[in-house]
């Protein structure tokens, strides 16, 4: 597991990084995480989040555009544990999560807007690997994302921590 410091990455790569608007909180068991972006666009339906968590995700971060909904949770403990088991580095969710105490103990990076106790409906709706826009940034599959307690940044290519 790599450790990332977003301020250091911003200083080292000012021409490459874009910084997300500061609206996310760190809920996961990892203080920092990063990797190649896989995107999901969904609204109050986490079917695709569950499907992707069940696949191998080594070196990847799931970026979920949940429309900023504060009415239900797109991630809970069971999906988070499955994602960790399958090697995902983390998830950045423009929406809510639940089971926060368990997720805080899970070896997975999780950034989201808030917690909410209600689960989503599973209707099989959503789009995978499409450009998504939130927090002042457009995310494309194959870009790279890095997150820590300071914030979240993206880059068109992988970044190495400065010496």
From Swiss-Prot:
GO terms for molecular function: 4-hydroxy-4-methyl-2-oxoglutarate aldolase activity; metal ion binding; oxaloacetate decarboxylase activity; ribonuclease inhibitor activity. Its EC number is 4.1.3.17, 4.1.1.112. One of its GO terms (biological process) is regulation of RNA metabolic process. It comes from the Bacteria. Gene3D superfamilies: Ribonuclease E inhibitor RraA/RraA-like. It catalyses: 4-hydroxy-4-methyl-2-oxoglutarate = 2 pyruvate; oxaloacetate + H(+) = pyruvate + CO2. A divalent metal cation binds at residue 99. Keywords: Lyase, Metal-binding. The keyword Endoplasmic reticulum does not apply. SUPFAM superfamilies: RraA-like. Substrate binds at residues 76-79, 98. Divalent metal cation. Its cofactor is a divalent metal cation. Catalyzes the aldol cleavage of 4-hydroxy-4-methyl-2-oxoglutarate (HMG) into 2 molecules of pyruvate. Also contains a secondary oxaloacetate (OAA) decarboxylase activity due to the common pyruvate enolate transition state formed following C-C bond cleavage in the retro-aldol and decarboxylation reactions. Homotrimer. PANTHER family: 4-HYDROXY-4-METHYL-2-OXOGLUTARATE ALDOLASE 3-RELATED, REGULATOR OF RIBONUCLEASE ACTIVITY A. Belongs to the class II aldolase/RraA-like family. This is Putative 4-hydroxy-4-methyl-2-oxoglutarate aldolase. It comes from Pseudomonas fluorescens (strain Pf0-1). The lineage of its organism: Bacteria, Pseudomonadati, Pseudomonadota, Gammaproteobacteria, Pseudomonadales.
